[in-house]
Amino acid sequence: MKKIVFTGGGSAGHVTPNLAIIPYLKEDNWDISYIGSHQGIEKTIIEKEDIPYYSIASGKLRRYFDLKNIKDPFLVMKGVMDAYVRIRKLKPDVIFSKGGFVSVPVVIGGWLNRVPVLLHESDMTPGLANKIALRFASKIFVTFEEAAKHLPKEKVIYTGSPVREEVLKGDREKALAFLGFSRKKPVITIMGGSLGAKKINETVREALPELLRKYQIVHLCGKGNLDDSLQNKEGYRQFEYVHGELPDILAITDFVISRAGSNAIFEFLTLQKPMLLIPLSKFASRGDQILNAESFERQGYASVLYEEDVTVNSLIKHVEELSHNNEAYKTALKKYNGKEAIQTIIHHISEA
């Protein structure tokens, strides 16, 4: 029986692509383990999947000054020792890393044990963890073809993003019943990220009188961002977040308005949903969402509205453009085969 160790954490985006791959390896009878941090979100997610989880010390890698930067390098070194010992006991054939600060000690620990390390980078440019880890990796899978120019060419393999199977199995009829929507009007699903997005939420609600004339709206507004005055608004359903219902909601969705996190937009791409992307500004991020969104716009998958340009009028204008050019977007979206990502990654894992 072949063995694999997965790692990645710090945010759900560094975990969910692993969950897309794991079921296929289970079918092939791989022995699967996961190494993450003591209290990260990856621990909560992975333990629900009935996968052996081993925690290690980890220090956060920051690009800015913080007093914790003095202590955290020592935590990283302890994490490397923890990971080295754990990997020596597990004796995996390969390590697959999805990035995030906890992955660095695991990658180095694997390299010290002479275990092949495969990385996956979701964004156009590598995050700090993967920048450090890539020198210890034998291969790095990229979601965007353009990412190759930022990485050692001899290690890069373009795959796209692995998408969880359950996302593709939504039920339109269940969504209609859950939302109380009509079949007669198209549906727009609006997602501002797990914490929501204040400017997007406010602008969407101001635009409702105009939008609801033609569309039904599902608004995932983030924790603490519900507007009680709109709870009974016909054609408008708001949620802090949804879990099991999301595939059904996406099945009934005609257009998506969203941030431009890589994992989410590749789910929309695989589902062939035209998108209006409002990426996080450079003031709130390292600019990766802007690059992601602009790549999708160039390929005809999405329209981009920059956060500083968001107004009621600009939002309505971009929604109308999505609707008017729906067929052109659909034609472009059909060119992408999302299933190839998992197949390619599984092939290289098996060959490692």
UniProtKB/Swiss-Prot annotation:
Signal sequence bounds: none
UniProt xrefs under Gene3D superfamilies: Glycogen Phosphorylase B
Transferase found in the keyword field: yes
Keyword terms: Cell cycle, Cell division, Cell membrane, Cell shape, Cell wall biogenesis/degradation, Glycosyltransferase, Membrane, Peptidoglycan synthesis, Transferase
Catalytic activity: di-trans,octa-cis-undecaprenyl diphospho-N-acetyl-alpha-D-muramoyl-L-alanyl-D-glutamyl-meso-2,6-diaminopimeloyl-D-alanyl-D-alanine + UDP-N-acetyl-alpha-D-glucosamine = di-trans,octa-cis-undecaprenyl diphospho-[N-acetyl-alpha-D-glucosaminyl-(1->4)]-N-acetyl-alpha-D-muramoyl-L-alanyl-D-glutamyl-meso-2,6-diaminopimeloyl-D-alanyl-D-alanine + UDP + H(+)
Pathway per the UniProt entry: Cell wall biogenesis; peptidoglycan biosynthesis
Molecular function per GO: UDP-N-acetyl-D-glucosamine:N-acetylmuramoyl-L-alanyl-D-glutamyl-meso-2,6-diaminopimelyl-D-alanyl-D-alanine-diphosphoundecaprenol 4-beta-N-acetylglucosaminlytransferase activity; undecaprenyldiphospho-muramoylpentapeptide beta-N-acetylglucosaminyltransferase activity
Protein name: UDP-N-acetylglucosamine--N-acetylmuramyl-(pentapeptide) pyrophosphoryl-undecaprenol N-acetylglucosamine transferase 2
